[in-house]
Swiss-Prot record:
It is found in: Secreted; Host vacuole, Host pathogen-containing vacuole, Host pathogen-containing vacuole membrane. Phosphorylated by chlamydial kinase Pnk1. A motif (Phosphorylation-dependent binding motif) lies at residues 161-166. GO terms for cellular component: extracellular region; host cell membrane; pathogen-containing vacuole membrane. The keyword Membrane applies. It is a multi-pass membrane protein. The gene is incG. The chain crosses the membrane at residues 37-57, 63-83. Keywords: Host membrane, Membrane, Phosphoprotein, Secreted, Transmembrane, Transmembrane helix, Virulence. It comes from Chlamydia trachomatis serovar D (strain ATCC VR-885 / DSM 19411 / UW-3/Cx). Residues 122-134 have a biased composition (Low complexity). Inclusion membrane protein probably involved in early modification events of the chlamydial inclusion. Binds to the host cell 14-3-3 beta (YWHAB); phosphorylation of Ser-166 is probably required. This is Inclusion membrane protein G. The modification Phosphoserine is found at S166.
């Protein structure tokens, strides 16, 4: 999030952008979204497993539907845990690959000077105020929305091409 905050603050104040690239920010935002969705899937499928097992073992309902629900929920739970663990390990590996200089540079961007201009004060302390952290979250959500919108645009283009070729 610090990366996205630095890039967008730099673009607004018009100096040269730091070493963070927009693709790194998009990758971080996508990883965060996948982590959040897989965590939600783990909780949802786990709770569905518990509820269906409780109904199944209480003996008050038909066995087959709840048995199917239980097996499907358990399969979803296992898959969601696998996805969650893979993404967590990817995030940990990307954090380990970052050098200490990059981490310090991200923590203290006011020390860096490029092309004679200093970065703006709001990017110099990205954690100083709640508005800067909100700005980072807003930019991450905006990039996710742009990615989803671009994907839907591509799907619509493909659908329109296939319709025009089918006639």
């Amino acid at each position: 999030m610090i990366c996205c905050d630095k890039v967008l603050s730099s673009v607004q104040s018009m100096p040269v952008i730091d070493k963070c690239s927009v693709t790194k920010c998009l990758q971080t935002a996508k990883q965060a979204a996948v982590l959040a969705l897989s965590l939600f899937a783990v909780f949802a499928s786990g709770s569905l497993s518990i509820l269906s097992a409780a109904v199944l073992f209480s003996g008050t309902a038909a066995v087959l539907p709840y048995l199917l629900i239980l097996t499907t929920a358990l399969l979803g739970f296992v898959c969601a845990v696998i996805v969650l663990l893979r993404n967590l390990s990817a995030v940990v590996q990307s954090c380990k690959k970052r050098s200490p200089e990059e981490i310090e540079g991200a923590a203290r961007p006011s020390d860096q000077q490029e092309s004679g201009g200093r970065l703006s004060e709001e990017s110099a302390s990205p954690q100083a105020s709640p508005t800067s952290s909100t700005f980072g979250l807003e930019s991450a959500l905006r990039s996710i929305g742009d990615s989803v919108s671009g994907a839907f645009d591509d799907i619509n283009k493909d659908n329109s091409r296939s319709r025009s070729h089918s006639f």
